[in-house]
Curated annotation (Swiss-Prot):
Protein name (record): O-methyltransferase elcB
Induction: Expression is up-regulated during the late stage of P.nodorum wheat leaf infection and is controlled by the cluster specific transporter elcR.
EC number: 2.1.1.-
Organism placement in taxonomy: Eukaryota, Fungi, Dikarya, Ascomycota, Pezizomycotina
Active site (record annotation): H319
């Protein structure tokens, strides 16, 4: 794009944001699209007028921000800064300790770390040698779930990423969750989820559970995009049973149950997870939201005599797994499905090149994150179709719905029937509100 085209895109997006305030019915949809366009155009503008040499040099320094964040999270520097007012680097150095490493960082190092963080927008400078919270850093104190996500990314995923070349040298392009950069980083041939289930891994498991809540509350992964993003849940027949596969403590099912009273829900997950979910399910929904201990690699309960429509819903599950294991998760669902049933996957659909650059990059960021930690992957629509083809020639994608409220997870609806032909990604498989790109 030329400079004039980019500035025109920014001007139009800004105007659309103003218009959103005058259109209450479609405000969230207009605002989401306008913000995406504005951020994408702004990033393209910066990229277009930075020399290739300088761009490469800047790119090579990006790991420094994560290294700084790693230290901040490990030593809990954000908790040493008061919610209101400011504190000196010397005072912070006196406060901070970690449970596994008592002791203090020198004032000079605390200052260097916080000054670096302030340079990329985390914290804000006060008087000389003092620091205060800004909106972003304060969230690390007030939102423990988001704090857990940032900690895991900086102190678990970041060290794993550094071991990716060694993991490839050692294991090749493995499909096994125990042969990952993460396993190399901890010096053990064990999967991340297996590690979490070990007695001394429970703290990390709890942190992971909080992190999943943190990334699902607000922003791109908010559950509200599933509930209020325009997917036609209201068109499902009265009494439809929605089976939330790997549904954790049931937060998505509970949110859907509140909005759509004609639907029933069954949350499936590991024993300890569903026990927790059942205990914490709101009393007024307990007659419509049930919990079942179920390994998603195992066959589904027999429901041939059940006349209800059954929707198998899996959110953020398949991306944790390589194609080998993702197929093993989908297969029992496909075997259980009848022509009136549906499978809905709430997953990232990696866009084709040349769409909004920000969206494309974030999709590939997540793809590498899955590779490093689990040997999982994010998938294009063609990859989902290929996975279904391997599992069952009767399983086909019907529609891909992109929430009108924004968000980065699509809802992929699939069904089984007697048809042997399959729609391609270039057909009318996307909903009317979705660009094919």
């Amino acid at each position: 794009m030329s400079l004039l085209q980019l500035t025109a895109s920014i001007t139009k997006a800004a105007a659309d944001l103003d218009d959103a305030t005058n259109n209450a019915a479609k405000a969230s949809e207009i605002e989401s699209k306008a913000k995406t366009a504005l951020l994408d155009a702004a990033e393209r503008l910066v990229l277009a007028y930075r020399s290739p040499r300088q761009w490469l040099i800047d790119l090579s320094f990006q790991h420094c921000a994560t290294a700084s964040l790693q230290m901040i999270m490990k030593y809990r520097l954000h908790h040493a800064v008061p919610k209101q007012g400011s504190r000196s680097f010397a005072e912070i150095a006196e406060i901070i300790t970690t449970p596994d490493q008592p002791g203090k960082l020198p004032e000079s190092l605390v200052g260097r770390l916080l000054q670096h963080a302030m340079s990329f927008g985390l914290f804000t400078p006060a008087a000389s040698g003092r620091v205060a919270h800004n909106d972003a850093s304060l969230l690390l104190v007030t939102d423990p779930d988001l704090e857990a996500w940032v900690y895991l990314c900086s102190n678990v995923a970041y060290p794993a990423g550094a071991q990716l070349p060694k993991a490839i040298e050692q294991y090749g392009a493995s499909s096994e969750p125990s042969e990952t950069a993460y396993s190399v980083s901890i010096g053990r041939r064990i999967s991340q989820f297996e590690r979490f289930r070990e007695p001394d891994g429970h703290a990390e498991h709890e942190m992971f559970a909080r992190a999943m809540k943190g990334i699902s509350a607000g922003g791109a992964y908010d559950v509200g995009h599933v509930v209020d993003g325009g997917y036609p849940w209201h068109e499902l027949p009265e009494g439809t049973l929605v089976v939330d596969v790997g549904g954790g403590p049931g937060h998505v099912a509970i949110a859907l149950a509140r909005k759509y009273p004609q639907l029933l829900f069954e949350v499936q997950d590991l024993v300890e997870t569903v026990e927790f979910g059942a205990k914490n399910c709101p009393k007024d929904l307990q007659h419509r939201v049930s919990f079942r201990a179920q390994d998603f690699f195992k066959p589904q309960p027999q429901r041939e005599t059940d006349s209800r429509t059954i929707v198998y819903f899996a959110r953020f599950i398949l991306h944790d797994w390589s194609d080998k294991y993702a197929g093993q998760i989908v297969e029992p669902l496909a075997q259980a499905m009848r022509p009136q049933d549906r499978l809905i996957l709430n997953e990232v659909v990696v866009p084709e090149p040349s769409v909004e650059q920000r969206i494309e990059r974030k999709s590939h960021d997540r793809d590498l994150l899955m590779l490093m930690n689990l040997n999982g992957r994010e998938r294009t629509l063609v990859a989902f179709e290929g996975l279904f083809e391997v599992v069952s020639p009767r399983l086909r994608v019907e529609k891909v719905h992109k929430p009108t409220t924004g968000g980065e997870l699509s809802l992929i609806t699939a069904s089984v029937d007697k048809l042997t032909g399959r729609k391609s990604a270039g057909g009318d498989i996307f909903g009317a509100n979705v660009d094919e790109a």
